[in-house]
Every structure is written in C-alpha cells, then in structure tokens.
Amino acid sequence: MKILHIITSLELGGAERLLTELVPYQKSKGHFVKVMILSDRGAVFKKELEDRGIEIVVAKSNSIKSFSNIFSIVNEIKKENYDIVHAHLVHAQYWTRLAKLLDDKKRKYITTEHSTSNRRRDSKLMRGIDKFIFSGFDKIVSISEATQKSLQEWLERDDNSFEIIYNGIDIKEFQLSEPYDKNELGIKEDDYLVMMVSRFHQSKNQLGVAEALMWLPVKYKLVFVGDGKLEDDVKKYCQKNNLMSRVKFLGMRKDIPRLLKTADIVVQYSFFEGFGITAIEAMASGKPVIASNVPGLSQVVEGAGILVGAKDSKELAKGILSLRNEELYKEISEKCLERSKKYTIKWCANNYLELYERELKC
C-alpha cells in the first residue's frame, strides 16, 4: 500500500508521538509511507522520523491556516498516487477534506480523532462545518471509547464509519531506558521528583499541578517537560508563590524515555484527554501515574494508577503524598507497568493496516 499521513505539525503531543511509532512500523511491513505536515514550527519529532528513514513533506505555505494547503495536499496525493490518505488533528482534517473535492480518484480517506473535546464544540455553527468535514472520510477512527462517544454526539451520527483503535507505544524503549542522575536535572538525589510531560496548553492544566506543590513538603520537586503559550503564566505563578526553587522547566526534549525513568511520580492532570499516551509511556517506565479522572484518561489509568479530581489541586497533592507509603508505591508501579503492556505499537499499527486493507476492498 501507498500511505500518506497528514498532520498539522510534529510538535510535542500525543497524536504526534503516535505517528513517530506508527509510521516506521508501517514502513517496516513493506508499505510506502510518507508524512506531510502543514507547518514545521516546533517540529520536535521531525528529525526523529527522518532518522528512521521517513520522508517528511512540509506544505508550501508552512502555515496551518493557509488556503494553499489544499493544493499542496492535492499535489502530493496525485504525485505519489496514494491508496490511503490519513489525516490527524483539526487543521489537517479540514484541509484534507477540502482537497478531496479536487481528487478525481477513488482512494480511501481516513481520519483519527485524538481528543474528547475542543473549542469548536462551543459553537452551533461549527457543528455544521464539522458534519461536512467528517462526512468526507471513509472511516473515522477514535483513540478511545470516550473519544468516539463525544464525537458521535457532536456530529449527531452513529454508523459503521466509526471505529476505535487505541494508541500504542514501543514498550521496550521505555522499559530499557537508563535514568539520569537527578542532579543532572538540578535536583538533589534524595528529593522526590514529580514530572509532567506535555505542551503548555489550557487543557493540560500545568497550573493545577503547580498549585498542588503548595500543599507538598519542600523535598518534593516538580519538573515540567514541554513548552507552549501558557508556560510564562505558570512561571509567573511559581515566582509569585516562591516556588521557582522547587520547579524546573526543561522545555522541549527528545529524551522522554530517560526523563520518565528519572521521575518518582508522573502526573497527567488534563481537563480533558482523548487517551493519555504519556500516561502509558510513564507506566511502561515502571512509574506510578496520577491522573485526572476525566474520560479517555481514566480508561487508561483506572485500576492501575491513581485518579483524582481534575479541578482539585489539594486532592492531587494528597494522591502524591499517599505514595510515600513504600508498599503502595510498589503496588501502583507494578500495576502501571502491567497495564502498559496492553498498549503496544505493534497491536495499534496492525489494527490500522487491517483497517486500510478492509477499506480498499470496499
């Protein structure tokens, strides 16, 4: 098969991280696979994919909002005559749907929905637009039951075009990584390291994690990995509350497996989440995960890690403190490690390939 994945960018994020594992696996099975991005701004995963032999095509505009993206997509599709065109994230979904109107060949168009919520769903006008956009895809994949349910309710549709395929990761990459010495991150070896890996976005709620630090002893240190528009807001909060000596901002990093191995606890405290691939990565690293009890994320963590209220930083702090109990820490860590084994990239990628093959036979 000839497969084109189109994604808004390759910034730090769950959908982007999935592609760094999914695409090389598909190529290893003998398929012709390329990735097209609308913008290479902050494309932390671009080099990783290129190093693994994946060709990355950047839209001519190098902008996620340019109308010319339609023609960049059409030109790439016709140039390689793809069998499958697979769009990820909203801007890629929109431009790909419009590009399809100019495509005169009956190839298959697939999209994956990666989140349970977004700002578009606050607008009745956007519902009509989204209905049109999603009507152009032969198959709509969701990364969890919660993601599919929320999308079906939004589109007011429930038909056989919907399918669920959970995200997956390379388990061994995280299991076998070597941790850093904490002092390499500017933290004392006997300090308790709480880590959050995510872009700084309102939905990810780094501010709530910083607030939880106010309820924790001074030996607890917080490390944020990622960047984004709201990073300065979190820094200002930490400065105002005299927390800067206890918080490290590492920015964008490519050594996520080693960083997760270095943490004592990993937190994912989102207001909403389609799946929670970072939680799975932390679990595969053998770390206990504390997450907000929201759809998508709770499905991954429940029964293994600890779930807390998404808007209660004091409850988050209590969850962190509960892991001072060595027996509980060991129990939660082991459960998390076992849970991660359900979500392998091999299982995920094979499910996508089987989906493509079924669609091409239709």
Place the predicted regions along the sequence by residue.
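N-terminal strand-loop element at the rim of the active site
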Residues: 5-68, 155, 229-230
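A conserved mid-protein helix/loop that constitutes part of the nucleotide-sugar donor-binding site
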Residues: 13-24, 192-215, 229-236, 280, ...
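Acidic anion/phosphate-binding donor-loop and adjacent secondary structure
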Residues: 64-68, 149-153, 159-161, 166-184
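Short His-centered aromatic/hydrophobic patch
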Residues: 87-95, 113
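Aromatic "clamp/platform" in nucleotide-sugar-dependent glycosyltransferases that forms part
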Residues: 252, 271
